[in-house]
Amino acid sequence: MFDLVLERMKWMDEKGIEQWNVMGYDEVYPLSYYEQKCSEGRAFALENKDGAILCAAVLLENDSRWSDDAPAIYVHNLVSKVGAGDAGANFLRRAGEYALRINKAYLRLDSSENNEPLAKYYENLGFIPVGTCTDGPYKGVRREKKLK
């Protein structure tokens, strides 16, 4: 998963997108963070038939960026392999199915407030903006999708 983050940061540099690549994302969320989330059973991945990871994220049942106690799964560190097509949408669909299986009503995430293409992507997948959040230099928009 960490390798995908590094690959995506390089892609952002190439595309002139200023997000993870200029915020020290790989230092805020180093390899040890992902190893810990894996050991806690909180890291999830979508793989191809050969076992290569196409998309991955950390799924949490609590998130300090949200102040309510609605039954939700919170998607963090979502990353897809560059060129993996609709892997992100497929991952989020499956994350929603998982959330329903464990009796959650919402799938929630946040994204950078200055990334309009990503905002449109999430809105097209049914995630509506419901507020903002701040984490150090990061300023984000909280989004949720009602599942039931």
Which positions does each model-derived feature cover?
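Terminal substrate-recognition subdomain of acyl/acetyltransferases
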Residues: 134-148
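Conserved beta-strand-loop-alpha-helix junction that forms the acyl-donor binding cleft
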Residues: 109-119, 135-138
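Conserved GNAT acetyl-CoA-binding A-motif
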Residues: 99-112
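Hydrophobic, well-ordered secondary-structure scaffolds
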Residues: 96, 131-135
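Conserved acetyl-CoA-binding loop of GNAT-fold acetyltransferases
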Residues: 122-132
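Residues forming the Rossmann-fold NAD(P)(H) cofactor-binding site
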Residues: 89
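Acetyl-CoA-dependent GNAT
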Residues: 3-15, 19-83, 92-94, 98, ...
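Short glycine-rich hinge loops at helix-strand junctions in the catalytic core
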Residues: 86, 103, 126
